[in-house]
Amino acid sequence: MRYLQVVKIGTSSVFNNGAIDYLVLSNLGYGVTKLRFERETSSVLVVSGAILLGMGEKGFAKKPDDKMELQSCARVGQPKLMDAYDIGLRAGYDRYSKEKGLSLRLLISQVLPTYHQLDNTAERRNIVAGLLHDANQGIIPLINYNDGVDPTEVTRDNDNLAARIAKTLVADRLVILTDVDGLLDADGRLVRRVSEINDDVRALCNGNGNGTGGMKTKLEAADLLLKEGIPTIIGNSKYGLLKLIENEDVRTLISR
């Protein structure tokens, strides 16, 4: 493959009233498949939602305060999150295959690093080698922090994880799918292009609900990549991956 992208899908984009939105995952599967076969682009996905799924399984209406309980929710929810992505991505993959008259097989892989592993040079190198190996074979790696074994992970956001992965892989771009259209100005209008993340840009940020990151963490992630010359696209998952990449009127592009 000529190109490599990292796609981060926020919890708020995947869940609708506490349940997995399979249409979002199907459209994502279609998008990454089309990019693979028509634009020589491999995709690495950074996913989240294990804790929320585990909360549902364990009967929690809101996030428990106890970190061990949060970790338990992550352990219960992580297998279900992978199952959901397998089903959803496969639906999009199969739709593309049918349109093109192809016989294709979807394979996904799961990577659950801890923050400490990413900070360790040898372990980080091994993680990256595995991601590139799978991506080059057409496998779609799904990455999530390993909340279930490291109590420090449950309070971290996956925007930062996505940026670190994109930087380490020297990806061609990071796409952050969320439930808003991108960065909005003080009047609620979409900011289509940002070339520098300064105090004026940071002042436009707000928080969010179920996830651990809001627009602030997305800008922090983009700022990290800006220094590396890697562009970041932030946009609403409802438009689909392809439209966000192609149409500058529906997303925020952060690039020099």
Protein language model regions, located:
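C-terminal catalytic "cap/lid" subdomain
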Residues: M1-R256
